[in-house]
């Protein structure tokens, strides 16, 4: 392992001991905000520190085994050779683990997420597939014990959604779901297709992190145009007969958010503002990323048929993840929310990109 990496790990070990001491300090315990921040830092350091201590132990085992090579006893020397081999393999494994643990963390990975699903090319079939993706994400959220809340929806004429925005609340929600951003293409025979021809439709998915209140960007009320209107619905006793739906336009960016799922205008406004903050923050994040790294691959596509991240082929039962050339013949399982088979390899590829960038920086 490089000396610079060792020094960094030693610094983290020292910091871990400092934080542990501070957590036992009465003045820190009395300050709940600081105590929570230090507790979070300690939990983040713990895994790296444990890995580094294991690395140090393996290094000590290797040195000890090398000393045994000086023994006169042939059997002892043979045993030493085996121990050296095992220690080197363990050091290699731990070094790879530590490199990943040292990768820069996205500070938003642990936040809640907003998922926007919009029907693109394909008309009614695109809206129906947008509904299928909503169901897929709902199942995935359920499997991860996350809470899912519909913020806004516009139903399709023949089922599904022209657009739906949901909030997913739970630990690590954004960190996993952020890789879903992009154009999702579906190939299948629509129920209304009498000739049995396969149609291609497109749906856009955009995933944004929630902006915590403490870090909320400042939105000038003068920059907002707020309209109220009557909620639309399928009819019946639950249709809202008052102007409780809200449409907020952020004039400087042109971002428009509508919320009409709640009966209360106040609740719809609060939801619309939280989505608006996330969208504005997403724009700022993208500007920053572009400035920092112009060659970075964007996770967000336009939703056009030609710009896709994933294809779902129903006749073949196939899912193709184009960003990493991954093909799975597990379409039914994926549509039922088994997304880890795709998100796991995507995360590994992302880590590999970060490791390559880190290696370039270190020369």
Swiss-Prot record:
Methylated by PrmC. Methylation increases the termination efficiency of RF1. The keyword Cytoplasm applies. Keywords: Cytoplasm, Methylation, Protein biosynthesis. Residues 284-306 are annotated as: Disordered. The keyword Cytoplasm applies. Pfam families: PCRF, RF-1. InterPro entries: PCRF (IPR005139), Pep_chain_release_fac_I (IPR000352), Pep_chain_release_fac_I_sf (IPR045853), Prokaryotic/Mito_RF (IPR050057), RF-1 (IPR004373). One of its GO terms (molecular function) is translation release factor activity, codon specific. One of its GO terms (cellular component) is cytoplasm. Peptide chain release factor 1 directs the termination of translation in response to the peptide chain termination codons UAG and UAA. This is Peptide chain release factor 1. It comes from Shewanella sp. (strain ANA-3).
